[in-house]
Structures are given as C-alpha cells and as structure tokens.
C-alpha cells in the first residue's frame, strides 16, 4: 500500500521477472494541422500540411468530443500522396481499433 505522501491517482503494482518494455520513443515533431479523411478498424487516411516519410511512425490522438471518446494510437505510414497544398497520408494502426471504438469515433 502506498504511503500518505504518495499522491498517485491509482496504485502501482510491482512487476515480475517476465515483465519487460519492448520500446520507448520520444515524440519530437509537431506535424501541425491534421484532418481525418476516413478511418477503419485497421487504419486511417489523413490530410497533413507537412509530408512524412512512408514507413515512419506517427502518434495520433483520435477524439470525438460529443461522445467523450479519446484514444492515442500509433500509425505506421503506408503511403504519402501530394495533393493541392497538402499531403494525403494513409497508415495502419499498430493495434487495430475495436468495433466499439470505431463506431464511437465516427457515429
């Protein structure tokens, strides 16, 4: 049990020998304005003002304020297509959305 000086909102649990961390990365760029064009369980199409390289990883915050939905996902960029004044970027979620998450996001 945590002591009185510990102000964490929830208790942290100790780990066992089998627990590990596969990776840690820094979010170093702010891509700027983004518009979601379409989304599926497995991926997303976005319009970005800056180009990003295919194969790069993006941290994407998805939200629907009306439904109180917020989720952060990692997207691997599959393709980048220049369009007038912007870039159409398609990517795959490293972990697919659930059907409930998808419908809450778009409906």
Label the model's feature ranges.
Residues 38, 76-79, 95:
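A residue-level detector for short acidic-glycine micro-motifs
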């Amino acid at each position: 049990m945590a002591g009185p000086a510990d102000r964490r909102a929830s208790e942290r649990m100790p780990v066992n020998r089998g627990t590990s961390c596969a990776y840690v990365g820094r979010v170093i760029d702010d891509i700027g304005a983004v518009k979601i064009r379409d989304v599926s369980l497995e991926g997303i199409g976005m319009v970005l003002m800056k180009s990003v390289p295919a194969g790069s990883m993006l941290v994407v915050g998805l939200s629907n304020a009306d439904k109180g939905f917020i989720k952060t996902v990692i997207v691997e960029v599959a393709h980048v297509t220049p369009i007038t004044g912007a870039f159409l970027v398609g990517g795959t979620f490293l972990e697919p959305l659930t059907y409930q998450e998808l419908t809450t996001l778009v409906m």
